[in-house]
C-alpha cells in the first residue's frame, strides 16, 4: 500500500543517484531502439551492442548538443573519448546563477575519459593510462580543487554493487520487449556508463589517491580518544603538510563510520586551511564499545573537542558542521558547552524525540531499520538498509495482521532493541530532553550558527526547532537560516548532489547553490575575519519558488506581510470536496470523516501523485478543502498554523494536513504539511487524551516552512487526512499506549468531525 517506505528511506539516506538524464522531447521519445535480448544476461554481448546504441541516440538528439550531461555519457559509451573530454570540460567549467554557484564535480568521468583516450590513442594498458591521466588531471590541481575532486574519486564500498543493481534494472525490459523507447534507452546508457566507469577504475584508484594524499597531507587514521567515562571514540585527522603550526579545527562527528566518507570530509576541511577531523560515535570504527545511537554523542563529541583543543596543532578553536545525524551531534555537543566549541553549521538536522524517530508523537516506519544499518556493527550494514523487499514485506505483514506495533521485531525475525527503547518513550520526556539543548539551555549558547534545510527536507522540523528555540531563549543569537526547495540531500550538500530538478519541480536558477562551498565561506567569516557570506543578508534567507529570487527577513514571522484565515466549510460539493470559507460556518456545522481502522482492503493500493508538481493527489481517508481562485498572485512564505475544532468518538486519532497550490493548469504544487497525534498537539511532553463525543480545540503551528509565488487564478487546497497506513504506527483511539494497541482495539469505525470554527492561517504577501 502507498509508496514504498523503502523508497522514502532511500531518499532520506541519500542512496539514490542524482537524476542526470532529462526527459526526451515528444518527437524523440517516439523513436525505438533495439538491442539483442541476450544482452540482458551476457556482458560480452552487452559491451558489443552498447556503442552502436549510444551512436544512434547521439544521431537522434534533439537538443542541438546543449545537454552536455547527457551528451558526454553517450560519447563515452560510443567510444568517442576525445569528444567526451570536450563535453566534460565545457560542463565542468559551467556554473549556476545562484548566490553560491554550483560547479559540476565530474572528476571521475574526466579521469576515465582521459584514460580511455590515452589507452586508445597510445596503445597503453588501462592501468598505465589511468596513472598517466591521474598525473595530468589530479596531481596538477591545487589542494582545494583536489579536495573537491577526491569526493568522487574515493569510491565507497557500496557504490559498485549499487550501480550493478541499477544496470540490471535498466536491462530488465530487454527480456520482454524487442526495443526500448528513447527514455529507457538513455537510462540504460547512463546506468551502463556509470557502472563500467566505476568498475574499471575501482581496483586502481585507491593507490593513486593514497599517493596524492600522502604528498599533500599528514593523515592520522583510527586515533583512539578516551572519554571521561572510560569509553573510546575514534578520529581521523588531516592536516596540510605546509600548514601553519596551529590552526582552527573543523569537526564532523558522525555515527556513519564509512572510512571513505570520513576521510573525504576531513580532507576537504584541510584543503580549505583548517585541521580536518572526523569523529565517530562510540562503538564505531576503532572504538571497541557497543554502538548506541543518540544517547552518548553529546558527551563524546564534547570530550573529543576538549582533546582537540589540547593538541599542539590546534589554536584552541573548533567549529562543527554536517547534516542529518551530524547536525544533531553539533547541538548535542553544544548542550555540554565545551570551551573550544566556537561555531556550528548544522544542516537538515533531526531533533530526537520531536521529528525522529517520530513526528507529532507518531512513529515512522522507515526509522525502524535505521538502527540496524547504523548501529549493528562498527561500520555500516548497507545490505540491511537496502533490503527494500524485506522491509516492505515486514510492514505489509504487520498491516494485514493488525498486531501491535511493538511486535515488529517478531514479525521481521531480528531483534531491534533500540527501536523498542524509543517506542517506550512516546512522550518528549527526560530521555529525549537529555540529548539536545532544552528550553533555557539555549540561552547560554552564544556561538554563531548557520542552519541549512529545505522545504522538502524530512528533518526541516528539527532544523527549525533549534532555530526557534535559540531565538526564543537568546533573542540576540547570531543564528542564520538558509532554506529553499531542497531535500534531505540537497539541503546539506547543495543542488550539485541532486540536479536542477526535485520530484518533478524544475528549480529556479537562483535556487541552485553549493552548500559545501557556503560552509567554508561561513567558517572563514567566523575564524579568519573574511566577509560574511553574501547570502546571509538577514537572519532568515529563503528562496521564493516560482519567483527566482532570494529574500531575507529578520524572523520567520516577518517572511509574510499578513496572515489570512481559511475556514473549513461543512457542505461537500458535487465532487465531494469542501469549500474554504472567508468566514466561519455555523458553529454546529461540520465535515465528517468515517474511517474503519480494521479495514485492510487498501493493502495493495497504488498511491497516486507523489511529485512536488503533480496532476493527481492522494485523497484517501481525507477531507479536501478548496479555496476560491486568487484574484492576483500571492506569495505564501513562512509557517502556517491553525485552530481545529474537532469531535470524535475515540480517545485519540492521528491526522495530517497537506497544503497544495492548485494551479490554473489543474496541476498541484506541494507547499507544506503538518502531522500530529491529536493527544500531543498541545504538548509533546505529555499525552492528553480526548473525551469521546466532546468538542475539542487543537491549536497548532506547523514546523515546516515554505515560500512559493502562487499564480493569479490558483487555489489553495488542504487535504486533511485521518491516518491509517503501513508506513507508520496506527492509532486505534482506545487511549492505550499506541505501540501496544492492536486491531482488536479498533472497535466501531472512527468518526472525526471538523466543525465550522476550524481554520488554517496562511502567511501571505502580495
Question: What role is predicted for each listed range?
Answer:
Residues 458-464:
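Conserved alpha/beta-hydrolase "acid-adjacent" motif
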Residues 312-325:
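Alpha/beta-hydrolase fold nucleophile elbow
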Residues 445, 451-453:
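Short beta-strand/loop motif that positions the catalytic acidic residue
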Residues 240-309, 494-506, 651, 657, ...:
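Cap/lid segment of the alpha/beta-hydrolase catalytic domain
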Residues 399-403, 496-766:
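C-terminal, loop-rich substrate-recognition/catalytic regions characterized by aromatic stacking residues
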Residues 203-245, 630-632:
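N-terminal cap/lid segment of alpha/beta-hydrolase-fold proteins
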Residues 146-197, 203, 208-211, 271, ...:
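Accessory cap/linker subdomain of secreted extracellular hydrolases
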Amino acid at each position: 500500500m502507498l509508496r514504498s517506505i523503502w523508497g522514502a528511506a532511500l531518499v532520506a539516506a541519500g542512496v539514490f543517484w542524482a537524476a542526470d538524464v532529462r526527459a526526451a522531447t515528444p518527437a524523440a521519445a517516439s523513436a525505438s531502439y533495439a538491442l539483442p535480448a541476450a544482452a540482458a544476461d551476457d556482458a560480452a554481448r552487452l559491451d558489443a551492442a552498447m556503442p552502436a546504441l549510444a551512436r544512434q541516440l547521439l544521431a537522434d538528439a534533439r537538443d542541438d548538443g546543449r545537454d552536455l550531461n547527457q551528451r558526454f555519457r553517450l560519447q563515452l559509451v560510443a567510444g568517442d573519448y576525445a569528444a567526451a573530454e570536450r563535453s566534460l570540460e565545457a560542463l565542468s567549467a559551467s556554473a549556476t546563477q545562484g548566490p553560491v554557484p554550483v560547479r559540476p564535480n565530474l572528476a571521475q568521468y574526466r579521469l576515465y575519459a582521459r584514460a580511455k583516450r590515452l589507452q586508445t590513442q597510445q596503445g597503453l594498458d588501462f592501468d598505465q593510462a589511468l596513472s598517466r591521466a591521474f598525473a595530468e588531471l589530479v596531481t596538477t590541481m591545487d589542494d582545494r580543487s583536489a579536495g573537491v575532486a577526491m569526493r568522487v574519486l574515493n569510491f565507497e564500498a557500496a557504490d559498485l554493487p549499487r550501480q550493478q543493481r541499477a544496470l540490471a534494472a535498466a536491462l530488465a525490459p530487454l527480456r520482454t520487449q524487442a526495443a526500448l523507447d528513447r527514455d529507457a534507452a538513455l537510462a540504460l546508457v547512463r546506468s551502463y556508463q556509470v557502472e563500467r566507469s566505476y568498475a574499471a577504475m575501482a581496483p586502481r584508484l585507491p593507490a593513486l589517491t593514497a599517493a596524492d594524499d600522502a604528498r599533500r597531507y599528514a593523515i592520522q587514521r583510527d586515533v583512539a580518544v578516551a572519554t571521561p567515562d572510560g569509553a573510546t571514540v575514534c578520529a581521523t585527522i588531516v592536516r596540510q603538510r605546509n600548514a601553519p603550526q596551529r590552526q582552527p579545527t573543523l569537526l564532523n562527528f558522525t555515527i556513519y563510520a564509512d572510512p571513505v566518507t570520513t576521510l573525504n570530509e576531513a580532507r576537504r576541511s584541510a584543503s580549505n586551511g583548517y585541521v580536518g577531523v572526523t569523529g565517530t560515535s562510540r562503538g564505531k570504527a576503532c572504538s571497541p564499545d557497543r554502538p548506541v545511537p543518540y544517547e552518548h554523542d553529546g558527551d563524546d563529541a564534547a570530550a573529543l573537542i576538549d582533546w582537540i583543543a589540547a593538541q599542539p596543532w590546534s589554536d584552541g578553536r573548533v567549529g562543527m558542521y554536517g547534516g542529518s545525524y551530524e547536525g544533531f551531534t553539533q547541538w548535542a555537543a553544544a548542550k555540554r558547552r565545551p570551551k573550544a566549541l566556537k561555531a556550528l553549521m548544522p544542516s537538515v538536522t533531526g531533533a530526537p524525540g520531536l521529528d525522529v524517530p517520530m513526528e507529532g508523537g507518531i512513529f515512522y516506519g522507515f526509522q525502524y531499520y535505521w538502527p540496524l544499518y547504523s548501529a549493528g556493527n562498527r561500520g555500516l550494514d548497507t545490505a540491511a538498509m537496502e533490503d527494500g523487499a524485506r522491509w516492505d514485506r515486514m510492514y505489509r505483514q504487520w498491516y494485514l495482521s493488525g498486531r501491535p506495533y511493538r511486535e515488529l521485531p517478531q514479525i521481521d525475525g531480528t531483534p531491534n532493541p533500540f527501536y523498542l527503547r524509543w517506542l517506550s518513550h512516546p512522550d518528549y520526556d527526560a530521555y529525549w530532553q537529555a540529548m539536545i539543548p532544552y528550553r533555557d539551555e539555549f540561552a547560554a549558547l552564544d556561538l554563531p550558527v548557520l542552519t541549512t534545510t529545505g522545504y522538502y527536507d524530512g528533518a526541516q522540523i528539527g532544523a527549525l526547532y533549534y532555530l526557534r528555540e535559540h531565538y526564543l531563549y537568546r533573542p540576540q543569537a547570531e543564528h542564520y537560516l538558509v532554506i529553499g526547495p531542497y531535500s534531505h540531500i540537497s539541503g546539506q550538500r547543495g543542488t550539485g548532489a541532486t540536479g536542477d530538478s526535485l520530484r518533478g519541480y524544475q528549480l529556479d536558477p537562483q535556487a541552485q547553490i553549493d552548500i559545501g562551498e557556503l560552509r567554508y565561506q561561513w567558517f572563514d567569516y567566523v575564524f579568519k575575519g573574511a566577509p560574511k557570506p553574501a547570502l546571509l543578508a538577514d537572519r532568515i534567507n529563503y528562496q521564493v519558488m516560482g519567483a527566482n529570487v532570494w529574500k531575507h527577513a529578520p524572523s520567520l514571522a516577518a517572511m509574510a506581510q499578513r496572515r489570512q484565515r481559511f475556514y473549513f466549510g461543512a457542505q461537500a460539493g458535487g465532487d465531494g470536496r469542501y469549500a474554504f470559507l472567508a468566514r466561519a460556518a455555523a458553529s454546529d456545522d461540520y465535515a465528517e470523516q468515517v474511517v474503519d481502522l480494521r479495514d485492510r482492503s487498501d493493502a495493495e493500493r497504488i498511491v497516486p501523485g507523489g511529485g512536488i508538481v503533480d496532476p493527481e493527489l492522494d485523497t484517501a481517508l481525507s477531507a479536501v478543502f478548496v479555496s476560491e481562485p486568487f484574484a492576483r498572485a500571492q506569495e505564501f512564505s513562512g509557517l502556517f498554523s491553525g485552530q481545529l475544532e474537532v469531535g470524535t468518538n475515540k480517545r485519540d486519532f492521528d491526522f495530517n494536513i497537506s497544503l497544495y497550490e492548485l494551479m490554473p493548469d489543474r496541476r498541484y504544487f506541494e507547499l507544506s504539511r503538518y502531522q500530529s497525534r491529536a493527544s500531543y498537539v498541545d504538548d509533546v511532553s505529555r499525552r492528553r487524551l480526548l473525551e469521546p463525543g466532546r468538542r475539542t480545540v487543537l491549536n497548532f503551528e506547523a514546523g515546516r516552512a515554505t515560500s512559493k509565488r502562487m499564480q493569479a487564478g490558483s487555489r489553495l487546497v488542504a487535504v486533511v487526512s485521518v491516518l491509517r497506513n503501513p508506513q507508520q504506527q496506527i492509532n486505534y483511539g482506545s487511549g492505550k499506549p499506541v505501540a501496544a494497541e492492536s486491531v482488536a482495539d479498533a472497535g466501531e469505525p472512527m468518526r472525526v468531525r471538523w466543525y465550522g470554527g476550524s481554520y488554517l492561517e496562511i502567511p501571505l504577501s502580495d
